[in-house]
């Protein structure tokens, strides 16, 4: 029985949703300490370098990013304030002005009431539309409203249509170029075949003429030469004797 009582809190903790634990952690963090300036919000000292401020902002942004708990508006507000603090302290001129205002201001402190933090007043005055500055810092992230989703869907469809159009146009150009190349190659091969055929026919005709001439010369050499025949004796004319 005592072992069951000891295991009961652990089982209850396992059954709690993850988002609820994040909300409780955020609420406990907000109640534990309220930063009074941008340096305390980022968790750095006033003499920190720009690289230290950048690393602190990345660390804090992972802890307070709205994607960890989209249904928690307090987490979004803290992240926007963190974004504003980094925007001011990451630039040399704005940081110099902020340090001057921070050192020159002397807010009165009373036991019965607490003054509102200075960074909160500047934050409320600087991000009148909070979403505009938030989304301007992170251009790759867009609000997930129904209207924005519809516009994003239309944009994606338009881009897809352009890609398909370019692909079809590329295929058409490739086909036309291939057909043209095929015609050029075919005409070249036909011309080459015509030249080769003409050379072959000419060579064949010359070979036939040479063979006929050689055969004729050979036949002439093989025939014997005929000797000139004497006329017969009866046909010989005797010379007449003209003596007295």
Swiss-Prot record:
Its main location: membrane. The chain crosses the membrane at residues 159-178. It is a single-pass membrane protein. Keywords: Chaperone, Membrane, Transmembrane, Transmembrane helix. It comes from the Eukaryota. It is found in: Membrane. The keyword Transmembrane applies. Residues 96-127, 208-244 are annotated as: Disordered. SMART domains: DnaJ. Pfam families: DnaJ. Residues 103-127 have a biased composition (Polar residues). Residues 37-102 form the J domain. The keyword Transport does not apply. One of its GO terms (cellular component) is membrane. PANTHER family: DNAJ HOMOLOG SUBFAMILY C MEMBER 4, PTHR44825. This is DnaJ homolog subfamily C member 4. The lineage of its organism: Eukaryota, Metazoa, Chordata, Craniata, Vertebrata.
